[in-house]
UniProtKB/Swiss-Prot annotation:
The keyword Transmembrane does not apply. It holds the Pfam family Toxin_35. Keywords: Disulfide bond, Secreted, Signal, Toxin. One of its GO terms (molecular function) is toxin activity. GO terms for cellular component: extracellular region. It comes from the Eukaryota. Residues 1-20 form the signal peptide. It comes from Lycosa singoriensis. Residues 21-26 form a propeptide. This is U11-lycotoxin-Ls1d. Expressed by the venom gland.
């Protein structure tokens, strides 16, 4: 009986440690991933670029994406 309780406690501790590690060290957001709600979560070699979506001159949304540092994107018409 003691062995079963001990085994259960050990398994619970292992699962708790794994969950805590996932929360504290969540993976960074990769290239072109959306970072609107977490602007500081892009991987170390990326930055979070934000864009305003306008409709008839009025902002209706804001979207952010992880992109490469020192890279400028231009609209190709």
């Amino acid at each position: 009986m003691k062995l079963i309780i001990f085994t259960g406690l050990v398994l619970f501790a292992i699962v708790s440690l794994i969950e805590a590690e996932e929360e504290s060290g969540r993976g960074c957001i990769l290239l072109y991933g959306e970072c609107t709600k977490a602007t500081d979560s892009c991987c170390s070699n990326l930055i979070c670029d934000c864009y305003r979506k306008l409709e008839k001159g009025v902002q209706i949304a804001r979207q952010c994406f992880c992109s490469e540092k020192d890279v400028i994107y231009k609209k190709d018409i």
